[in-house]
Each structure stands twice: as C-alpha cells, then as structure tokens.
C-alpha cells in the first residue's frame, strides 16, 4: 500500500539520479515499482530467520539510471515480438520492466533485513555447480550432452540471460554462507549508494 506522500518522496530520491550533470538529455522517463517495496516489507515482516533469494533482470542504481535508459526499461512482449507500446495489444501482451536492485536493498535494509549477496545469474549458477552438473554427462553422448549444454549456455552466457539477470539474497539472522555468492559477489555496487 502506498502511504500518502510516498510517491513524491521516491521521486525526490530519483530525480537527482536521472539528471546528473554529464547527461545531455532533456527528458528522463523511469518506472517506479511501488509494489516491490510492499513485497520486500512483507518478506521482512514474515522472515524470522534465514534467507530469501530473488532472481530477476535488472541493475543496480548506477546502471539503472544510465543515460541510455532515459526512456525507462519497460518492454512489451507479444508472440515472441518485443516492443515498447503498452497500448498496442492491451490485455494480450506481457509488460515488463527491470528491477532497481539498489531500491530493493534500500527498502530491505530499512526494514531490518541484511544484504547477503548480489551477483549475476551466471556467477550464481557457476558458484552453485552448474558446470559440474554438465561435466557428469559424457561429451560423446551428444543426444544428452548438446541439449544440456545449450540450456546451460542460455542461462550463463552474457549474450543471453547470464549477465542481464541478477541474483540478490536478503536475510535475517542467517548463520550459513551462501555458496552462490562465494565468488563474484557484487554487493558493494548496491551498498555504495546507501
């Protein structure tokens, strides 16, 4: 639920990010995901001990408000075609936008959660052993190996989902190390803006 005046407070935080001196743009459009804030608050209220791992496509604040994204990140998908007009096929198309992982972290920390890790999907899956799973299949067994290798490539390739998708872990009183963040943890990218 949006508390009265909260939208203006959020906008005041974002405006300086979208209008940095080095940007030569007149208009900057951006999405504000108000429901994500409520979602993170509900996790913080429910979670007593442990970790929550979230995977989605998005960026930390510096990348999210880059001048290349001065028209926002919203994309529409209809029958394997992508475009940016939400009124083209209303009710029939998927409408998506990227996650501002710094905003997620800000709300999480403000609600008593800890940032336990942040990295790319590729690094997370490699840390969790995806390459070891593939190595169990003999390369000579092409009918099993090739489909699995193609699926893994889609998940970890920088040109596919590997770098665009990010993984963030938030928690309370978590005593266990999270293997997915042992190498390549980029939490510092989110913490520097806090």
Regions found by a protein language model. Name each.
Residues 1-13:
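Short phosphate-coordinating micro-motif centered on Lys-Gly-acidic
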